Amino acid sequence: MDTLLIAADSALRTLFARPRAGEPSPARSLPAVDLSVEQRRLSSALMRVNHVGEVCAQGLYMAQSCVTRDPQLRSDLLAAAREETDHLAWTRERLDALGSRPSLLNPLWFAGAFAIGLVAARVSDQASLGFVVETERQVSAHLQGHLRRLPEADLPSRAIVDRMQRDEERHAAQAQAAGALPLPPPARWLMKAAAKVMTTTAHHI
């Protein structure tokens, strides 16, 4: 029951409250930059997609922590969720600075990620960890692509994305070391297809 209450609290905080980071944003010490209208529009779209990714991460980790009966794994999942909360706060701060807003479909993204996390976790802890590994690897690849697309002048956004990518790679490595099972190719393909729908939609809405 305590875990379910924690998950419900996380959902409410993720979707309806302004997230509080435990660590200052990597962009905090950087000066404001003067971007053109087109540059600002592109940065806003990419950071909105990144914010959606962090909303999904909260749903995924919370679902998995609700199901596992392994205290150490639950602790590790909740620790990863706290780090993802930093990312959530940083991307929201950057969206505010760019004069933009999060995706209007965040409740849908969170619910979908939570449902997928529940399904993966009910198979086994190892399968759940395998899902984490694949998710974090795909997110890392998306972030690398965003680093190539973000305007060179947008140093604050680039600093945030660079730090996020390094954190996601570490999360994948930790899940792998904890005994993750590799996902079958069809599952990886479905995840990529779902991510494509999400990123394309969040880019605009």
Curated annotation (Swiss-Prot):
It is a peripheral membrane protein. GO terms for cellular component: plasma membrane. It comes from the Bacteria. Fe cation 2 binds at E84, E136, E168, H171. The keyword Protease does not apply. Keywords: Cell membrane, Iron, Membrane, Metal-binding, Monooxygenase, Oxidoreductase, Ubiquinone biosynthesis. InterPro entries: COQ7_proteobact, Ferritin-like, Ferritin-like_SF, Ubq_synth_Coq7. Fe cation 1 binds at E54, E84, H87, E168. GO terms for molecular function: 3-demethoxyubiquinol 3-hydroxylase activity; metal ion binding. Its cofactor is Fe cation. Transmembrane segments: none annotated. It is an enzyme of class 1 (oxidoreductase). GO terms for biological process: ubiquinone biosynthetic process. It catalyses: a 5-methoxy-2-methyl-3-(all-trans-polyprenyl)benzene-1,4-diol + AH2 + O2 = a 3-demethylubiquinol + A + H2O. It is found in: Cell membrane. Binds 2 iron ions per subunit. NCBIfam families: DMQ_monoox_COQ7. This is 3-demethoxyubiquinol 3-hydroxylase. It comes from Acidovorax ebreus (strain TPSY). The lineage of its organism: Bacteria, Pseudomonadati, Pseudomonadota, Betaproteobacteria, Burkholderiales.
